[in-house]
Amino acid sequence: MSEGVAQLKHEGSRQQVVVAGAAAGLVSRFVIAPLDVIKIRLQLQIHSLSEPTSYRGLNGPVYKGTLGTLKQILRDEGVTGLWKGNIPAELLYLTYGSVQFSAYTNISQMLDTIPAPYTLPSSANSFISGAGAGAAATTVTYPLDLLRTRFAAQGKDRVYTSIVASLKSIAQHEGPTGFFRGLGAGVSQIVPYMGLFFASYESLKPVMADSPLPLPLGSSDAVAGVVASVVSKTAVYPLDTTRKRLQVQGPNRARYVHRNIPTYSGVLMTLQHIWKHEGRRGMYRGLTVSLLKAAPASAVTMWTYERAMGIMVAFEKDGME
C-alpha cells in the first residue's frame, strides 16, 4: 500500500460513510440512467437478430445494439423514455450506496480484529468485505431494484402508472414474495461482483496514485473504479441477465416492451433455458452497454465518495481547530 493512500475502512466516521455513500449513489444514478434503461431493454430481448424468423410478426420493438436501441427509444418514447424508472432507481442508489459503504467499512474493521496467525491478507479482507456489503445492500434494496427494472421495461403500454400503483398491484397480485423475484440471482451475482470490485479497487488505488502520469482532481480513484468494474462485471454478467428475466415475471409479463418473455422459475432453470434457446449471446446480451454503464458509474461513484468524504473530513478538522 502506497504511503498516504488510505483504504476505505480507514476513512471517516460511520455517519460520514453513510452520507458519502448516499451522495455517490445519487450522482452516479443520474449520470448513467439512460444506459441503464438501454441495458435492461437488451437483456429482456430474447429473439436472435441473426434469425429474422424469431421476431417476425412480433408485436413489439426489435433492438439492434446500443446505438440502435437508443435511437429507437428516442423515436418511440421520447427523451423521457431514457429515464423510465428513475425515481425508484434514485431511491435504490441512495439507499444502496449508504448500506454498501457502511457494511463494507464495518465488516472490514471486524475482520481486522482476527488475531494472528489467522489474520487475513488485505486482498482477502477486501473481497470478503465487498461480498458481504453487496449481499446486505442488495437484500435491503431489492424491492426498489425490481421496481426500477419493471418501469424501465415498460413501453408505450404503461403497466404501472406510478410507484404507489406498482406497489399496490404487486402486493395484491403477487404477494410479498413478488417484491423479491430474482433475489437469489441478484445475491449470487453481487457477492462475487462486489468482492472482486472492492478487492481490485483497493489494490489499484495506490497504484493509480503513484502513476507517473498526472491524474488531476483525484481521478486516480475514478480510473481504479473503472478497471475494477470492467473486470468484475464481465465475470458475473450471465447472473445479471438471469436476475432481470426473473424480475419481470408475474401476471404482467406479456405487457412489457418485449411481449414474448418466457416463463422462468428459479435461477438454475432460467440459466439453462437461456443457454439452450439463446446460447452464449443470450447470456451476454447487453454486455457492451452494461460495461459502458458500469465503467462510468463506478468511476463517478468512487470519485464522488472519495471527494465527499474528503470534504467532510476537512470540515471536521477545521471545526476542531
From Swiss-Prot:
GO biological process terms, alphabetically, are: thiamine pyrophosphate transmembrane transport
Q: Which UniProt keywords apply?
A: Membrane, Mitochondrion, Mitochondrion inner membrane, Repeat, Transmembrane, Transmembrane helix, Transport
Q: What residue spans do the Solcar repeats cover? A: 12-110, 121-207, 216-311
Q: Which Gene3D superfamilies match?
A: Mitochondrial carrier domain
Show the GO MF annotations: thiamine transmembrane transporter activity
The lineage's top-level taxon is Eukaryota
One cellular component term (GO) for this entry is: mitochondrial inner membrane
Keyword Ribosomal protein appears in the UniProt entry: no
Give me the segments passing through the membrane.
Answer: 17-38, 91-107, 127-147, 182-199, 213-231, 286-303
* Membrane topology designation: Multi-pass membrane protein
Instruction: Read off the SUPFAM superfamilies from this record.
Output: Mitochondrial carrier
List localization entries: Mitochondrion inner membrane
Q: Pfam families this protein is in?
A: Mito_carr (PF00153)
Alphabetical list of InterPro entries matching this protein: Mit_carrier, Mitochondrial_sb/sol_carrier, Mt_carrier_dom_sf
Q: What does the function comment of this entry state?
A: Mitochondrial transporter that mediates uptake of thiamine pyrophosphate (ThPP) into mitochondria.
Question: What family does the Swiss-Prot or TrEMBL record give for this protein?
Answer: Belongs to the mitochondrial carrier (TC 2.A.29) family.
Q: Protein name, please?
A: Mitochondrial thiamine pyrophosphate carrier 1
- Name the source organism: Phaeosphaeria nodorum (strain SN15 / ATCC MYA-4574 / FGSC 10173)
| Gene that encodes the chain | TPC1
